[in-house]
Curated annotation (Swiss-Prot):
Catalytic activity: ATP + H2O = ADP + phosphate + H(+)
Subunit record text: Interaction with ESR1 and NCOA3 is enhanced by estradiol. Interacts with acetylated lysine residues on histone H1.4, H2A, H2B and H3 (in vitro).
Binding-site residues for ATP, renumbered to this chain: 298-305
Protein name, entry field: ATPase family AAA domain-containing protein 2
Pfam families linked: AAA (PF00004), AAA_lid_3 (PF17862), Bromodomain (PF00439)
Glycyl lysine isopeptide (Lys-Gly) (interchain with G-Cter in SUMO2) cross-link site: 148, 959, 979
One GO CC term on file: nucleus
Spans annotated as Disordered: 32-211, 961-985
Gene: ATAD2
Modified residues (Phosphothreonine): 980, 983, 1024
Coiled coil: 801-825, 917-943
Length: 1091
């Protein structure tokens, strides 16, 4: 309001001042007329040049008279017009430009009126005249032609007159922003009654253009750049997306054959993606749609993302390819309101346009969490948008959506239904066969390949290892082999020559790798399943086999999962289902498949479906439960039950022990118990493991006991949920409620017995007869390898390029040199047209200066420089500046500093040099100069000449002492010579190191800092003594140990085994084992069960 009043007051003041000036001018003219200063001739001459001004004066006088006559009425009407003028101020200001443009027209009209002699004495003076509203018409947008940026241009065109451009993105004061905003509002609002349809159309055009630009940012990962040239160019113009467009680089070598242990999941993905493309007639016949969504869930490192990558590569093969889009969970999230939903819509639109396509959401729990009242509303909006896009009113067509998560409970339940995520694939820990297959995949490129029996044993020991853990073990084993064979590489930063054939991975490398790495599944919670160790396996393997045999009678599914005697012809996982692939005749379900009589009979007395009632198709059990009972120390909880669970590792195991119930303070024990049993029912067949149930039952309260028994009773009778428990008390000593859970008559009780004589003999035989008689470890081979001096490896040879690659490379290099020549011509032209440097544009005439050739050996001028540019003699700017320096040095050398003319030439030569350097420094990009030098070096190595691309018919008139002939200084191709790499030094063998330990070799070995030479030579020079072992005494000691341990339990046997092992470790360096045998006999005799 203050601003509007200020404008109004200022306008009135200006008009009042103009009226006063015109009055004074009119009064002066009257005085001159009264004095008779002008005669008629002068008056006519004056009117000839001041006719327009006099007309203006006359009009001003008339208006002034009218204003004086109507001043009273104007003051009365001022109050009435005040509100109208205030409301029109903004419009009047907006029309200032139009009024200024129309002033000339108004003046012409007034002139014509005055010439006719018509004067309106009754006309009143007004500040503004309202005009008719002129509606805004949007001008046609002219296409903007973006000039291609020059690769060598990084500054102004001239160092003398630099160009400055005001950047609109620079910081400005708030006052300037406010003034610009107000000025834009004044000049952009032509009329208050303009229609809003124009703005809406403009907004729609902008939104459409923005949408098209944003869609081009979403490109599939499995398409190459040359396959999407148009889209890729648009994307490069647009720039980076708000989301992470390339969250990971897609490894094209990962295929379905690189995924082990997940054949069922791969077959299901083929049904969803591959089969609809290959066999569309099948789906067309039954008018069905294949599943369009699946959810991968499971612990980290089990292959969820790996399967997605393999699927992307499989979809990239063949004629009809599938576009694969990959997004991480938080890629679509944005701080701007509505931007996340917009990116999701754009993603699905782009996938629909490039259908068939796949959208893979990694870590989808971060994108679509469970909606709740305590959650931020932005996530609820994103989840709602994703739900509508996956299965809303608009069909998403041939778009398959795959989600991966580690937390299935954190995903919104609305996503987990058919139509959105039709299938859910559990990526559990791999079993023995899957681990063996994964090991084969990671070691199939090794030379030599490991034995199949070794891989089977390794897979058996890798319990709880995931696919990522197994891959890490293979890599760590290879590093252990490298560290063992060549320890020298860890003491130097230079690359040494290695004999790759001497690096062999052994079993001990895998042992060291497994000791170093802890599986991810065992870092937080240790898996209950664990195979018997090699130490106790001879002692307890028979007991484990008996438990499994008893378990198969109670839980027939165990036989189904542990039986590996499938025919090799039908080993395909798709043929494991007897119900789906049986050859039994089944009645037809079609109307025309049965006669009328048989159809009526089928409707009355025949059932088509036999769900859970056919014993031939699947095993059946009634409330499977088993209790392993033994005395304390029999190993039922520490060895036997984990071994049984390991044998049944294909089943999902849920542990319900004391730490699980009371370890989490956020939930009550009853809630934890209910959740465990609920999950066991959902993932049946499964196992509920309750270790030490006698202690468990004494600690928990009555509420948890009632909850546990009630949940067990609510499990269906034929549900394959096994309850496995262990107890250190006999069945009769347990509480009555526990006894009712396990019935002895049903074979649900297994009593553990003490190991027999044969098991104990196998248990101690290896320790006493083999390990006690083993000679000390020799390290001479390791010392020889440490003394080996490895030569420095030569630089790697460049990869030989094919003819097509060489051609493409030369074309790229020639494009770069073309830019260089254009730049050098521009610089030379700017120097040549300068009048100061006209003397250097042409060669020196020998007729005018006869002694010039004798003084200057290498003449040079700007015309010769232009000729060398045309002949492709300049590969870098340094070569060009070298000739500029030559022009300057020749001028300084030939023109002495005596004559004023010579001084002027010397001055202009220095100015030429400085100007050339200044222009190049100002306008040349440093990266472009470095690129030219690299190309020059590459051409020298390849032996490629730059004259190959020079003009074919570029002839120059021969001149004596031409600078183009024999110019060795300025030709970059003749300045340097290729450097041949030195021949590598032959690697010496360890035996040669020992036989010839010279002073130089000694210093090289000491620089490696692996072992001192004196100590190494002392170890190698020591003779190997003979081994002294009394095998008869060892056999007698074994018999004594077996006899004494007749009534020992598992813990006591392990204790005795540890005592004997300590004796062997203390005498591990002795070649005479007599003292060791005496020590073992003494320890066995003093060993007591009370320990």
């Amino acid at each position: 309001m203050l601003f509007d009043k200020l404008i109004t007051n200022t306008a009135e003041a200006v008009l009042q001042k103009m009226d006063d000036m015109k009055k004074m001018r009119r009064q002066r003219m009257r005085e001159l007329e009264d004095l008779g200063v002008f005669n008629e001739t002068e008056e006519s001459n004056l009117n000839m040049y001041t006719r327009g001004k006099q007309k203006d004066i006359q009009r001003t006088d008339e208006e002034t008279t009218d204003n004086q006559e109507g001043s009273v009425e104007s003051s009365e009407e001022g109050e009435d017009q005040e509100h109208e003028d205030d409301g029109e101020d903004e419009d009047d200001e907006d029309e200032d430009d139009d009024d200024d443009d129309d002033d000339d027209d108004d003046d012409d009209e007034d002139d014509e009126d005055e010439e006719d002699g018509e004067e309106d004495n009754q006309k009143r003076y007004y500040l503004r005249q309202r005009k008719a509203t002129v509606y805004y018409q949007a001008p046609l947008e002219k296409p903007r032609h973006q000039r291609k940026p020059n690769i060598f241009y990084s500054g102004p065109a001239s160092p003398a007159r630099p160009r400055y451009r005001l950047s609109s993105a620079g910081p400005r004061s708030p006052y300037c922003k406010r003034m610009n905003r107000r000025r834009h509002a004044i000049h952009s609002s032509d009329s208050t009654s303009s229609s809003s349809s124009e703005d809406e159309q403009h907004f729609e055009r902008r939104r459409k253009r923005s949408r098209n630009r944003a869609i081009n940012r979403y490109l599939p990962l499995n398409f190459r750049k040359d396959e999407l040239k148009g889209i890729y160019k648009d994307r490069m113009k647009i720039g980076a997306s708000l989301a992470d467009v390339d969250p990971m680089q897609l490894d094209s070598s990962v295929r379905f054959d690189s995924v082990g242990g997940l054949s069922n999941h791969i077959a299901a993905l083929k049904e969803m993606v591959v089969f609809p493309l290959l066999y569309p007639e099948v789906f067309e016949k039954f008018k069905i749609q294949p599943p369009r969504g699946c959810l991968f869930y499971g612990p980290p490192g089990t292959g969820k993302t790996l399967v997605a990558r393999a699927l992307a590569n499989e979809c990239s093969q063949g004629d009809k390819r599938v576009a694969f889009f990959m997004r991480k969970g938080a890629d679509c999230l944005s701080k701007w309101v509505g931007e996340s939903e917009r990116q999701l819509r754009l993603l699905f639109d782009q996938a629909y346009q490039m259908r068939p396509s796949i959208i893979f959401f990694d870590e989808i729990d971060g994108l679509a969490p469970v909606r709740s009242s305590r959650q931020d509303q932005i996530h609820s909006s994103i989840v709602s948008t994703l739900l509508a896009l996956m299965d809303g009113l608009d069909s998403r067509g041939e778009i398959v959506v795959i989600g991966a998560t580690n937390r299935l409970d954190a995903i919104d339940p609305a996503l987990r239904r058919p139509g959105r995520f039709d299938r859910e694939f559990l990526f559990s820990l791999p079993d023995k066969e899957a681990r063996k297959e994964i090991l084969k995949i990671h070691t199939r490129d090794w030379n030599p390949k490991p034995l199949d029996t070794f891989l089977e044993e390794l897979a058996e020991n890798c319990v709880g290892y995931r696919g990522a853990d197994i891959k890490s073990i293979c890599a760590e084993a290879a590093l252990c082999a490298l560290r063992r064979r060549y320890p020298q590489i860890y003491t130097t930063s230079e690359k040494l020559q290695l004999d790759l054939s001497s690096i062999n991975i052994s079993a001990k490398d895998f042992e060291v790798a497994m000791q170093k790495m802890i599986p991810a599944s065992q870092r937080a919670v240790t898996s209950p399943g664990q195979a018997l160790s090699t130490v106790v396996k001879p002692l307890l393997q028979n007991t484990v086999d008996k438990i499994l045999e008893a378990l198969q009678r109670v839980f027939p599914h165990a036989e189904f999962r542990t039986n590996k005697t499938l025919d090799s012809d039908i080993s395909c996982p798709l043929l494991e289902s007897d119900l789906a692939y049986s050859d039994d005749d089944v009645p037809s379900v079609y109307e025309n498949g049965l006669s009328q009589k048989s159809s009526h009979k089928a409707k009355d007395n025949f059932n088509f479906l036999h769900l859970n009632r056919n014993a031939c198709y699947q095993p059946m059990s009634f409330r499977p439960r088993i209790l392993i009972v033994g005395e304390p120390g029999f190993g039922q909880g520490s060895h036997l039950a984990p071994a049984v669970i390991h044998a049944l590792e294909k089943f999902t195991v849920y542990t319900l022990d004391i730490p699980v119930l009371f370890g989490v303070s956020a939930t009550s024990p009853e809630e934890t118990c209910a959740q465990v049993i609920r999950e066991a029912k959902r993932t049946a067949p499964s196992i509920v493991y309750v270790p030490h149930i006698h202690v468990w039952w004494e600690i928990v309260g009555p509420t948890l006991k009632a909850t546990f028994t009630t949940l067990l009773q609510n499990i269906p009778s034929f549900a394959p949920v096994l309850l496995l428990a262990t107890s250190d008390k006999s069945h009769s000593a347990l509480p009555e409620e526990v006894q009712e859970l396990f019935i002895r008559d049903y074979g649900e009780i297994f009593n553990v017995q003490l190991p027999g004589k044969e098991e104990r003999t196998k248990f101690f035989e290896d320790l006493i007869l083999k390990q006690a008689a083993k000679p000390p470890i020799s390290k001479k081979k390791a010392v020889l390898q440490a003394l080996e001096v490895l030569p420095v490896a030569p630089p790697p040879e460049p990869r030989s390029l094919t003819a097509e690659e060489v051609k493409r490379l030369e074309e790229q290099e020639e494009d770069t040199f073309r830019e260089l020549r254009i730049f050098l011509r521009n610089v030379t032209h700017r120097l040549a047209i300068d009048k100061r440097f006209r003397v250097f544009t042409k060669p020196v005439d020998p007729d005018e200066v006869p002694d010039y050739v004798t003084v200057i050996k290498q003449p040079m001028d700007l015309s010769s420089v232009i000729s060398k540019i045309d002949l492709h003699k300049y590969l870098t700017v340094k070569d060009y500046l070298r000739d500029i320096d030559l022009i300057c040095s020749n001028a300084l050398e030939y023109n002495p500093d005596r004559d004023p003319g010579d001084r002027l030439i010397r001055h202009r030569a220095c100015a030429l040099r400085d100007t050339a350097y200044a222009i190049i420094k100002e306008e040349l990009d440093e990266d472009f100069e470095q690129l030219c030098e690299e190309i020059q070096e590459s051409r020298k190595k390849r032996g490629c000449s730059s004259s190959k691309y020079a003009p074919s018919y570029y002839h120059v008139m021969p001149k004596q002492n031409s600078t183009l002939v024999g110019d060795k200084r300025s030709d970059p191709e003749q300045n340097e010579k290729l450097k041949t790499p030195s021949t590598p030094v032959a690697c010496s063998t360890p035996e040669m190191c020992v036989l010839r330990m010279t002073r130089a070799r000694r210093s090289q070995v000491e620089q490696q800092q692996l072992i001192s030479v004196e100590k190494a030579l002392a170890i190698l020079s020591q003779p190997t003594p003979s081994l002294v072992v009394d095998h008869e005494r060892l056999k007698n000691l074994l018999k004594t140990v077996v006899k004494k341990s007749r009534n020992y339990n598992i813990f006591q046997l392990e204790n005795l085994y540890a005592v004997i092992s300590q004796c062997i470790y203390q005498h591990r360096k002795d070649y005479d084992k007599t003292s060791l045998i005496q020590k073992m006999e003494q320890e066995v005799e003093n060993f007591s069960c009370s320990r």
